Amino acid sequence: MTVVTITPGAMSFADWRAIYEGASAALTVGAWDAIDASAAAVARIVAKGDPVYGINTGFGKLASVRIASDDLATLQRNIVLSHAAGTGAPSPTPVVRLMMALKLASFGVGASGVRRETAAMLEAMLARGLIPVVPSQGSVGASGDLAPLAHMAAAMIGVGKIDVGGAIMPAAEALAQAELTPLELGPKEGLALLNGTQFSTANALAGLFRAETLFRSALITGALSTEAAKGSDAPFDPRIHALRGHIGQREVGGALRTLMAGSAIRASHAIDDPRVQDPYCLRCQPQVMGAVLDLLRQAGATLGVEANGVSDNPLIFADSDEALSGGNFHAEPVAFAADMIAIALCEIGSIAERRIAMLVDPALSGLPAFLTPRPGLNSGFMIPQVTAAALVSENKQRAYPASVDSIPTSANQEDHVSMAAHGARRLLDMADNASAVIGIELLAACQGIDFHAPLKSSDALEAAHRHLRSHVPTLDDDRHFHPDMEAATALIRSGSLVAAVPASLPGVG
């Protein structure tokens, strides 16, 4: 198993993606000294006896209740058990694994006050593939992702359930099989495990990873559709995009030029083409997809900062033995980033669906109706376009900003929340919808290109065409369409379409 070394504050987009895709994670050696110093500071604060939130007081609205020294361990266990109140379907294992690594990285900064044993338990569970079962619903994104992180923490103390290679078993049993002893929490540790934005951030990053793959796939299918409709590459001229100046627009224009370079199909209508301008879904790809790229990068920058920061409360400053209460648990930046990704996913699918609709309409594409050689007897791509329209409409509904919502909790002590978890959790479903739309476009565009034989497209797009045809044959007559759609969508989701094309395409990280 690949192991990513967690260097707190210096983790890259690629590092987090590797963990999401199955790598384990281990703290860099230097982080353990920071953890030890922070834990020692908590011990000195406890010995001093002054009331400090989360160490010797109650939580939330009960912060004014002082807790006796003999009850401090019980206090931390109680917060884990009482806050493990999530509901809904289990979160995807890759998301939970990433959440655990994000929490481990946060502890490694040395501002949470946890002991070495607590961080080591997270590290050991990651190394052994012990992934807590975490219900997906229950967080409002402040005070942190309390319920989801409580389910993670519960597994660490031997309560709840753990996924071990797809087998769900009681946490205590899974820990015993891995020769791990359930944690006994010390002062501040229960709160440190629960307080933070790691669940929302993990879900948002997962959505961003999928969005990047989708974005690159859609550049390829967009170029294929342009070829199928005998569209012009003139709108991708770099002089146009230089005058406007947006970086994403310039990069997308360049990518489309690269993808279409050397096309015999394009050369066949480069002179005396009666069409002066293409529909927006072809002509404005650099403007639309460039804006998508810029938005994804902005979201990525925000999540990169969040993933490398500390969203605990209170924060422990070991050099002065201070515990400062603040609001780093408020996930507003993550909520905004998730909303950006949702909008981007929506637009990737939206413009692709318009290209599909254009291709099946002979008045717009010049191709046979619904891309079938014998329309009437055959319906061809009639209903796949309807499916794409349905999926795009569903994503439009889901793209409503989560961050504009708020609801008071904890007896109005926590009176403004981010809804980051809600905003981030929807992203994988939206990515699934958009993947299916791009898969349908891949089928439709390659079908359209087949009508131009023996003319060939560019080397890059011919590689994409061959890759699809190695899985799905040309549609000569109507057949069961669902398997074709599933196969094409799998090429999009896996990233294999992008890998098959010999071109460097812009991305987030």
Swiss-Prot record:
Q: Where is this cross-link: 5-imidazolinone (Ala-Gly)?
A: A142-G144
PTM note says: Contains an active site 4-methylidene-imidazol-5-one (MIO), which is formed autocatalytically by cyclization and dehydration of residues Ala-Ser-Gly.
Q: So what EC number does this one have?
A: 4.3.1.3
Asked if Cytoplasm is a keyword of the record, the answer is yes
**UniProt keywords, alphabetically:** Cytoplasm, Histidine metabolism, Lyase
Q: Where in the cell is it found?
A: Cytoplasm
- One of the record's GO cellular component terms: cytoplasm
Give the matching PANTHER family: HISTIDINE AMMONIA-LYASE (PTHR10362)
Protein name per its UniProtKB record: Histidine ammonia-lyase
Organism field? Sphingopyxis alaskensis (strain DSM 13593 / LMG 18877 / RB2256) (Sphingomonas alaskensis)
In the UniProt record, the gene name given for this protein reads hutH
